[in-house]
Amino acid sequence: MGIMNGKTVIITGAGRAVLSDGVSCGSIGYGIATAFAKEEANLVITGRNVKKLEDAKEELERLYGVKVLPVQADVSAGSDNKAVVQNVVDATIKAFGRIDALINNAQASASGVTLADHSTEQFDLAVYSGLYAA
């Protein structure tokens, strides 16, 4: 029995993609979810892309036999962020009755842009999502 058996973990930014050739392309959040799945935790995975969340759910359940709840959630939602987070909490409690750990992994950023090249708005979004979304 895994050390997280019966525990519930929320992991933000935990989607995964399957490439056209069938190869899995994970994320840091997906890697974290895999580690908790190996320890038999119930998982709540969040992200912006429903397809990536469904791919992650399917693979984690198939490989590790754990329960996975994918919840679409954009932690960069700005003023709506409280509602987004509350939806994740409510869905988790409804599905599993408890929350034992939160891994605040997701962060909005401008992909492929160096920090020096971020606009003020891009920088603010990265800071907001990284510090306040949890």
Describe the predicted segments one by one.
Residues 77-94:
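Conserved Rossmann-fold cofactor-binding substructure of NAD(P)-dependent oxidoreductases
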